[in-house]
Curated annotation (Swiss-Prot):
This is Biosynthetic arginine decarboxylase. It comes from Pseudomonas putida (strain ATCC 47054 / DSM 6125 / CFBP 8728 / NCIMB 11950 / KT2440). NCBIfam families: PRK05354.1, speA. One of its GO terms (biological process) is putrescine biosynthetic process from arginine. The lineage of its organism: Bacteria, Pseudomonadati, Pseudomonadota, Gammaproteobacteria, Pseudomonadales. Substrate binds at I290, D291, V292, G293, G294, G295, L296, G297, V298, D299, Y300.
Length: 637
C-alpha cells in the first residue's frame, strides 16, 4: 500500500483511507467518485459496481491531445444512471404501496441546456422521461429534441407566440401541458386554441403558503414569482369553463423551492398542495396529473443533514413521501391516483460534471524569522513578540495566541502613528506568524477549549493558491449564493496534506475566490492541500458542478468558456472522448462586447508605426499582438 513518508500524531502512517476521510469523498461522491490505492481520484460513471476511470490519467491524456486547463469534464453515463435511480425509486414505491398510476421524471432544461445533457437524459432506456421548458428558446429546443409522443410541460411567462408554439407541439404529436402561471395567459390560450382548432391540455400552478427553508425558498411560498392564489385559481377555472375548455384542465403544478434540505419541510408543503388536487376534482375538473415541481436536493457537503448544502434524505425517502402521501389522501377522499411528475433537474445533473483547475502560484505568510542581533534595540512591542517565539506550556497555548494577536494590534497602531519603521513592522509580522504556526501545531481539534483558536489560525495561516480559472465563469453559485462544492486534489492522496489553502481565481476582483470547503464532516474556510513541488502541475477537481453552473457563468474580466469534453465508458470498461469543445479565444470574448479584433489590429498597426522602435521590433510586436488575439483568455497551462 502506498503511504505517506511521515507519520501522523498517533504514530501511524498516512494512507489513502485518511484522505478519503479528510475530503469526505465517500459521503458526497454518491458512489461515483472515490480515491484509489495509488492516491488518485477515480470515477465510476455507471455506479459503484462499474469499472473505475483514473481521472488524473484521463486529464493527462486529454492535455497531451491538445486540450488545456481549466477543463470541464462531463460524464454523460452518470446522467443516465441518475435517471434510472430516480425513476427506480418512484417505481419501487409505487409497487410497494400499490399506487394505481405511474411516474414520469421531467427534466427542466434550464438546469443545463447542453445538447449532450438533454439528449443523454431522454435517451435513457426503459424509463418514463419528459422535458420542461420555461422560455421560448427552451420550448423550441424541446420540441425538436423530445421524441414523438413525449411529455413536454411549459412553465414560465408566456406570450401569444409561446402558446402558439406549444399548441403546435401538441398537434405534432407531443403530450404538451401549458401551465397557467398568470391569469393573463388564459385569454391567449383560449384564442390560440380556437385559431389552431386544438383542445389544449392545461395545467394550473398554485402558489402555496408553505415555505421550505433553503437558499431558494422565495421560489415557493406566497412571495413566489409564479403561481395562482386561491381566488385567482377559481377565476381561471371559471374562464376556461365559460370557453368550454375546462375539461382540458389535466394537471396541478406547484413548486416549493430548489434544494430542500429537510424532508419534513417538503412533507408540510405537500400536505397543502394535495388539498388543491381534491378541490379541483370536486369542481368537476378531470385533473389526473400532479407535477410536484423541484426540491429534490443534492448532498454537496456529504453531511446528510439540514445544512443548505446538504439533504437529510435520499431519493427513495423522497419518492416514498410523494407516493405515500398522495395515496393516503386519495384513498381517504375516494379519488383516483394521479400520474406523478417531478422536476428534479439538480439531482439528475449535478454529479455528471467536474472542473479541473491547476495551481499556478502559491502565496504563503513569511514566518521565517531572521537572526536578531540586538533585541533590546527593538521597540518594546516587537520585543514582546520576539519573546513569544520561545517554548510555550501546553496549558498556555490559547493565552499565548491572544497575547500575540493583541501585540500585533499595537504594532499596526504604532506603525500608523509613525512610531515603527517598515523594517520593524515586517519583523513583527514574521514573529507573529512564526508564533501562530508553532501554536497551530500544538492545538488539538478534539479539545473544545482549542477549537476557536484553531479555527482562527486555520484562516490566518492558510496559503493562497492562485488557480487558473474564473469563479464567475465556472462556479458562479459559489460567489452569488455561497454554494458549497466539494474540492479535492486529483493526485498525491497517498500523502498527507500538510498545508491549508484558500483558492483564488485569475479575475481582478476580490470576490474571485472560494470561501467554503468540505472538510471531513464540516464546512471550513480553507481546505487541506499538499505543498506544491517545484515544476509540478498540482491539479484540483471541483465536483458536482453539472447543475446551473455552466449556463449561469458570466464573462467577468472577459474570461470565457473553458475547454470541455464528454467522457463515455464502454461496456468493457474502456473509455472514449466525444463532444470536445475548445475554449473561447480572446478574440471571441472581445467580439461579445462588440470590440472588433480587426479594428483593434488597425489601431495596433497605427501605434506600432508611430512608435520609436526598429523595423524588426515592429514586426515582432504586431506578430505578438495578432497571436495574442487567438489565445485562450486563461493562462497557458
Amino acid at each position: 500500500m502506498s503511504v505517506r513518508r511521515t507519520r501522523k500524531d498517533d504514530g501511524s502512517q498516512w494512507t489513502v483511507a485518511d484522505s478519503r476521510s479528510v475530503y469526505g469523498i465517500r459521503h458526497w461522491g454518491a458512489g461515483y467518485f472515490a480515491i484509489n490505492e495509488a492516491g488518485r481520484v477515480e470515477v465510476r460513471p455507471n455506479g459503484p459496481q462499474s469499472a473505475p476511470i483514473d481521472l488524473f490519467e484521463q486529464v493527462d491524456e486529454l492535455r497531451q491531445s491538445g486540450l488545456s486547463l481549466p477543463l470541464l469534464v462531463r460524464f454523460p453515463d452518470i446522467l443516465q444512471d441518475r435517471v434510472r435511480q430516480l425513476t427506480g425509486a418512484f417505481d419501487a414505491n409505487i409497487a410497494r404501496l400499490e399506487y394505481q398510476s405511474q411516474y414520469t421524471a421531467l427534466y427542466p432544461i434550464k438546469v443545463n441546456q447542453q445538447e449532450a445533457v438533454v439528449e443523454n437524459i431522454i435517451a435513457t432506456q426503459n424509463v418514463s422521461i419528459g422535458l420542461e421548458a420555461g422560455s421560448k428558446p427552451e420550448l423550441l429546443a424541446v420540441l425538436a429534441l423530445a421524441p414523438k409522443g413525449g411529455t413536454i410541460v411549459c412553465n414560465g411567462y408566456k406570450d401569444r407566440e409561446f402558446i402558439r408554439l406549444a399548441l403546435m407541439g401538441q398537434k405534432l404529436g407531443h403530450n404538451v401541458f401549458i401551465v397557467i402561471e398568470k391569469e393573463s395567459e388564459v385569454a391567449l390560450v383560449i384564442e390560440e386554441a380556437a385559431e389552431l382548432k386544438v383542445k389544449p391540455q392545461v395545467g394550473l400552478r398554485v402558489r402555496l403558503s408553505s415555505l421550505a427553508s433553503s437558499k431558494w425558498a422565495d421560489t415557493g411560498g406566497e412571495k413566489s414569482k409564479f403561481g395562482l392564489s386561491a381566488a385567482q385559481l377559481l377565476s381561471v377555472v371559471q374562464r376556461f369553463r365559460d370557453a368550454g375548455l375546462d375539461q382540458g384542465i389535466r394537471l396541478l403544478h406547484f413548486h416549493m423551492g430548489s434544494q430542500i434540505a429537510n424532508l419534513a419541510d417538503y412533507q408540510h408543503g405537500f400536505k397543502e398542495a394535495i388539498r388543491y388536487y381534491g378541490e379541483l376534482r370536486a369542481l368537476g375538473l378531470p385533473v389526473d396529473h400532479i407535477d410536484v415541481g423541484g426540491g429534490l436536493g443534492v448532498d454537496y457537503d456529504g453531511t446528510h443533514s439540514r445544512n443548505a448544502s446538504s439533504i437529510n434524505y435520499d431519493m427513495d425517502d423522497y419518492a416514498g413521501v410523494v407516493v405515500g402521501m398522495l395515496k393516503e389522501f386519495c384513498d381517504a377522499q375516494g379519488l383516483p391516483h394521479p400520474h406523478i411528475f417531478s422536476e428534479s433537474g439538480r439531482s439528475l445533473t449535478a454529479h455528471h460534471a467536474m472542473l479541473v483547475i491547476q495551481v499556478t502560484d502559491v502565496e504563503k505568510h513569511n514566518d521565517d524569522v531572521p537572526t536578531i542581533e540586538n533585541k533590546e534595540a527593538l521597540p518594546e512591542t516587537v520585543q514582546w513578540l520576539v519573546d513569544l517565539l520561545g517554548p510555550t506550556d501546553i496549558e498556555m497555548v490559547t493565552e499565548t495566541y491572544w497575547r500575540a494577536t493583541h501585540y500585533m494590534g499595537d504594532v499596526a497602531a504604532q506603525y500608523a502613528d509613525g512610531k515603527l519603521s517598515l523594517g520593524e513592522k515586517a519583523l513583527a509580522e514574521q514573529c507573529y506568524f512564526a508564533v501562530c504556526r508553532r501554536l497551530h501545531n500544538s492545538l488539538k481539534a478534539r479539545q473544545r477549549s482549542h477549537r476557536q483558536v484553531l479555527d482562527e489560525l486555520n484562516d490566518k495561516l492558510a496559503d493562497k493558491y492562485i488557480c487558473n480559472f474564473s469563479v464567475f465563469q465556472s462556479l458562479p453559485d459559489t460567489w452569488a449564493i455561497g454554494q458549497v462544492l466539494p474540492i479535492i486534489p486529483l493526485h498525491r492522496l497517498d500523502e498527507e496534506p500538510m498545508r491549508r489553502a484558500v483558492l483564488q481565481d485569475l479575475t481582478c476582483d476580490s470576490d474571485g475566490k472560494i470561501n467554503q470547503y468540505v472538510d471531513e464532516q464540516s464546512i471550513e474556510t480553507s481546505m487541506p492541500v499538499h505543498a506544491v513541488k517545484e515544476g509540478e502541475d498540482y491539479l484540483l477537481g471541483v465536483f458536482l458542478v453539472g447543475a446551473y453552473q455552466e449556463i449561469l457563468g458570466d464573462m467577468h474580466n472577459l474570461f470565457g468558456d473553458t475547454d470541455s469534453v464528454n467522457i463515455y465508458q464502454n461496456a468493457d470498461g474502456s473509455v472514449y472522448h466525444a463532444g470536445i469543445e475548445t475554449h473561447d479565444t480572446i478574440e471571441d470574448m472581445l467580439r461579445y462586447v462588440h470590440l472588433s479584433p480587426e479594428e483593434l489590429m488597425t489601431h495596433y498597426r497605427d501605434k506600432v508605426a508611430s512608435a520609436k522602435i526598429t523595423a524588426r521590433e515592429r514586426t515582432q510586436y504586431l506578430d505578438a499582438l495578432r497571436l495574442g488575439l487567438t489565445r485562450s483568455s486563461y493562462l497557458s497551462s
